[in-house]
C-alpha cells in the first residue's frame, strides 16, 4: 500500500471523486465546503486542476481506496471509499502528508463529521476555528 501524488486522472480516480462530491454535498455544510474548495471552478474540473498542480494524494493498494486534497499547508478534503473505511486509510494518508516538507498545519472538517474530527484528534490536532455563515 502506498500514498502517492496522483499522476493523472484515471477512470478509477474520477469515479471516486464523483462519489466524494455526492457524499460531501449531502452533508451539513457540504455545499459551502465545495464552494470554498472550487472557488468558481466547476467541481468536476477541480479534480484535473488538483492533479496537475500536485495537490491530490491518493492511497492505492490493490485498489484506489482514498485521496486527500492538500493545498498551501491546508488539508481541504480527505475521502475514503465507503468499503475501505475503518481500516486506517484516512489516517495513513494524513500521516503521510504530515511527513511532507510542506506539511499541512490546518484541515477542514464538516460540522457533525465525527469520523473526520476523530481522525484529526488522533494525530493530536484540536478544533480551533468554527466558521459561521448566514443563510
Positions of predicted regions on the chain:
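Conserved GNAT-fold acetyl-CoA-binding loop/helix
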Residues: 18-46
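A structural microfeature
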Residues: 64-66, 90, 129
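Conserved acetyl-CoA pyrophosphate-binding loop and the N-cap/start of the following alpha-helix
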Residues: 84-97
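Conserved N-terminal entry element of GNAT/NAT acetyltransferase domains
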Residues: 1-19, 23-24
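Conserved beta-strand-loop-alpha-helix junction that forms the acyl-donor binding cleft
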Residues: 85, 106-121, 125-126, 133-135
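Conserved beta-strand in the GNAT
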Residues: 57, 62-79
